[in-house]
A protein has these predicted regions:
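Conserved Nudix-box catalytic region and its N-terminal flanking loop in Nudix hydrolases
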Residues: 1-29, 37
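Nudix hydrolase/Nudix homology domain
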Residues: 2-12, 57-140
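Intrinsically disordered, low-complexity boundary segments flanking structured domains
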Residues: 36-38, 51-53, 79-85
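Beta-rich nucleic-acid/ligand-interaction surfaces
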Residues: 41-61
Length: 140
């Protein structure tokens, strides 16, 4: 599974209109540090779509879940990650899966420890619609 998880930092992620942190700046930083993606060359902040909000009551943490559409092929991302990125240790591996409901559902259902199920579900519904995604999932 590949994810970008970053803590929001006021000084590091400060927006351009004041001292408040900017969630898009935080996401851009995470994409750079964990996957080696460069803003402007590989994506823009406008390519980031936040899809849902989550809260861990056990750890008193909140999270924004979303997707980003990048201008790179998956082989470019894997090669960049393999060559070393700042926070490579935060992901154990990158397992490319075609982004279709069928391929993603097959992957998720064969990897029981897969922890991004809610995020993946929201991303699939965003791209393909709830009815289609639910029908694919129901076939398992």
């Amino acid at each position: 599974e590949t994810s970008v998880v970053e803590g929001l930092s006021r000084p590091t992620d400060r927006g351009t209109h004041g001292d408040a942190p900017d969630i898009y700046r935080c996401a851009c930083r995470g994409l750079a540090e964990e996957l080696g993606l460069r803003e402007s060359a590989d994506f823009s902040a406008a390519d980031i779509t936040f899809l849902s909000f989550g809260v861990s009551t056990q750890y008193a943490l909140w999270a924004l879940r979303g997707i980003v559409k990048i201008k790179r092929d998956v082989s470019d991302v894997v090669a960049r990650w393999d060559n070393g990125v700042k926070d490579k240790f935060e992901n154990q591996d990158i397992l490319p899966v075609p982004f279709t409901p069928q391929d993603v559902a097959s992957f998720v259902f064969t990897h029981q420890s897969f922890s991004l199920k809610p995020t993946i579900y929201h991303a699939l519904v965003h791209e393909f619609g709830r009815e289609h995604v639910d029908a694919v999932i129901a076939s398992y």
